[in-house]
Regions:
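Short linear motifs in intrinsically disordered/low-complexity regions
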Residues: 77-78, 97, 188
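Membrane- and cytoskeleton-facing regulatory interfaces of eukaryotic small-GTPase pathways
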Residues: 78-79, 86
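Short alpha-helix boundary/capping and kink motifs at helix termini
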Residues: 2, 26, 30-56, 85-151, ...
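Proline-rich intrinsically disordered, low-complexity coils
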Residues: 20, 58-61, 68, 88, ...
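N-terminal extension/subdomain marker
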Residues: 1-78
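Basic- and aromatic-enriched surface patches that contact anionic nucleotides/nucleic acids
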Residues: 1-30, 38, 144-191
């Protein structure tokens, strides 16, 4: 790091409150300053929310982002390309949330509420995002011999269940539509 970059580095820490690692990522062009600052604001909101009793949390509705080009966001570690390669026949359907929960395999069921210690951090981040007007991708479900499984979006599903959202969109593989439809009703629209 040359002297000019070092001065920028120090200024990012002093003037913007960045950690040394955050400042380094900005200097090296790995992240934009505006993104780092936005993430810091989100993290502060999350930490503040986690300290509140669950009765004091906001209960924002889930706004679903159903645009196919962003379905890959329903699962961790996927890009648009890798999602399309792994799930070339992905499609969106709407389901009754309670019916889906009843038919989930035991490993996919959330038996605790979204405020339990296992889920509280992710729930807080989700609630902050939704409360700020953000949208989220639908959960993805698959079928195998054990039943239905949520393979992406369990926290979003859990929050929708907590706020008693009656119907939710889910992503399925068209090749599994018939098998899934033997367990739950599938609709092509939210109404």
């Amino acid at each position: 790091m040359d002297d000019e970059d070092f001065q920028k580095f120090k200024a990012l820490i002093k003037e913007n409150g960045l950690s040394p690692l955050e400042a380094l990522k900005v200097i090296e062009g790995e992240q934009l300053l505006c993104n780092v600052l936005a993430e810091k604001v989100i993290n502060e909101k999350v930490e503040k929310l986690k300290k509140k009793h669950k009765a004091k949390w906001p209960s924002p509705p889930v706004k679903w982002d159903t645009v196919p080009e962003r379905w890959y966001l329903s699962m961790d570690d996927h890009s648009t390309e890798s999602f399309a390669m792994k799930f070339p026949d992905a499609e969106l359907v709407w389901v009754d949330l309670a019916q889906l929960h009843d038919k989930l395999a035991n490993g996919s069921k959330r038996v605790k509420d979204p405020f339990s210690s296992n889920y509280k951090c992710k729930t807080a981040r989700l609630v902050v995002h939704l409360d700020d007007g953000g949208e989220v991708s639908p959960p993805m479900i698959i079928h195998n011999k054990a039943g239905l499984h949520i393979v992406g979006g369990n926290h979003r599903f859990g929050w929708a269940r907590h706020i008693a959202q009656p119907k939710i969109p889910v992503i399925i593989c068209a090749s599994q539509r018939t098998a899934i439809a033997t367990l739950i009703d599938l609709d092509n629209s939210p109404t």
